[in-house]
Each structure stands twice: as structure tokens, then as C-alpha cells.
Amino acid sequence: MSNVDHAEIAKFEALAHRWWDRESEFKPLHEINPLRVNWIDEHISLAGKKVIDIGCGGGILSEAMAQRGAQVTGIDMGEAPLSVARLHLLESGLEIDYRQITAEAMAAEAPEQFDVVTCLEMLEHVPDPASVIRACATLVKPGGQVFFSTINRNPKAYAFAIIGAEYVLQLLPRGTHDFKKFIRPSELGAWSRDAGLAVKDIIGLTYNPLTKHYKLSADVDVNYMVQTVKES
């Protein structure tokens, strides 16, 4: 059975035309993107690296990594976001290989072909996140790095990521997230280790509603990112 939640795909398909509108529902992604890319680039210089972006959507992260000199492949199961991503290349002038394929199928096709794998804001949208993590581990070369980001599962995360972000501040459309699909760092760490990935770093991403700014933080109670390395 394919590890795809068609209802999740449909949500992002419906919004695809607004992906590059910085004042749209995707404004948070645009605002956190520089923080994410800088953090990744600090751990492994992206210039000249072969990178695959899992769940690339409209290409916000993929383009940012290509701008840093990476050779980027972006994969997603949403046809509409991929169309938007390809069209935006005409504006940016970047070269990125976008493909409609699952992480698992790509792993079977191209094992150990990438220096870096990114899987950001994606694991909480699939039925079996552990399967995606295994695919990421297969795709990356020995000694290569895999980066994940997702949302913690606890009362604070429910209050901030769903009640706060979707209902009070209306940063995201209602129904964007399902609390049951949120992932604790301990779970992500266990799945990573089972897949042969060693967790090396974890950092939180917090939002200040007064200043309307995001920053990297030691607080991993809500949004967080993880750096892992494939054991040689």
C-alpha cells in the first residue's frame, strides 16, 4: 500500500496557486525558510552537494538550497504544487529536477545517491512516517546527512500549532494539521536509529506573536528540526 494520505495531498493541491505568494497561507513557510536553510548549511555546506528535498511542495526550500549551489532534486506527490514549482523556475532561473514520486519509490530507484536529504514539514502528513525515514536513510550516501522538521505532540504543541496558529492568529488554514500525527522527538529519534541514522543535533523553532518573528531556540516543545548522519 502506498504511503500517501490523499486527503493531505488534496489540501495542498487546493492552495498550490498561492505557494509563492508571501502574504498567503504559505507566509510562515517563507518566513522560516532562511532560518532552516542557514541551519542546514551550517551543518553541511550545500555548495556542490547532491540534495533531495522530500515533500518539496511548490519548491520554497528546494530553490533556496539551489541558490546555495546545491544540485537539487525535489519530489512530491502533489501534481499541482509540482507544476507551480516548475513554473517558478522560469522566474528564478534555477535548475531543479522536480518529480512526482514517493520517497519509498525514489529510494528503490536511487539508493545512496545523495549527499543530503531534507524532509521538512512532511512527516506529520503521511500515514507511516517511519517508512519515509527509512527511505531517507536509503537515499543518502554513507556519512551523508538527513534533516527532518516536524511538530512535537504534547498539550503545548496543540495549543500553539493548532489553536494558536490555525484559529487565533490564523497563520495557517484550519485543518492544516492533525494533532494525532504530530511526532515526539523521542519517536523521531527511535525511528531514525532503527533506519541507521544517528541523531546529531536538535533545535526548536519558535514564533513570537508580538514581534511576529520566528527564531531558532532550545525550546523543542512545538516546532523542531533534527540533524542525522547515516552511519558508514
From Swiss-Prot:
Entry's EC annotation: 2.1.1.222, 2.1.1.64
Keywords: Methyltransferase, S-adenosyl-L-methionine, Transferase, Ubiquinone biosynthesis
NCBIfam families membership: UbiG
Functional pathway: Cofactor biosynthesis; ubiquinone biosynthesis
CDD domains: AdoMet_MTases
A GO BP annotation: methylation
Matches recorded under SUPFAM superfamilies: S-adenosyl-L-methionine-dependent methyltransferases
Entry similarity comment: Belongs to the methyltransferase superfamily. UbiG/COQ3 family.
EC top class, as a word: transferase
Any one GO MF annotation of this record: polyprenyldihydroxybenzoate methyltransferase activity
Annotated organism of origin: Stutzerimonas stutzeri (strain A1501) (Pseudomonas stutzeri)
Name of the protein in question: Ubiquinone biosynthesis O-methyltransferase
Reaction equation(s) it catalyzes: a 3-demethylubiquinol + S-adenosyl-L-methionine = a ubiquinol + S-adenosyl-L-homocysteine + H(+); a 3-(all-trans-polyprenyl)benzene-1,2-diol + S-adenosyl-L-methionine = a 2-methoxy-6-(all-trans-polyprenyl)phenol + S-adenosyl-L-homocysteine + H(+)
Keyword Transferase: yes
Binding-site list for S-adenosyl-L-methionine: R36, G55, D76, L120
Gene: ubiG
Primary role: O-methyltransferase that catalyzes the 2 O-methylation steps in the ubiquinone biosynthetic pathway.
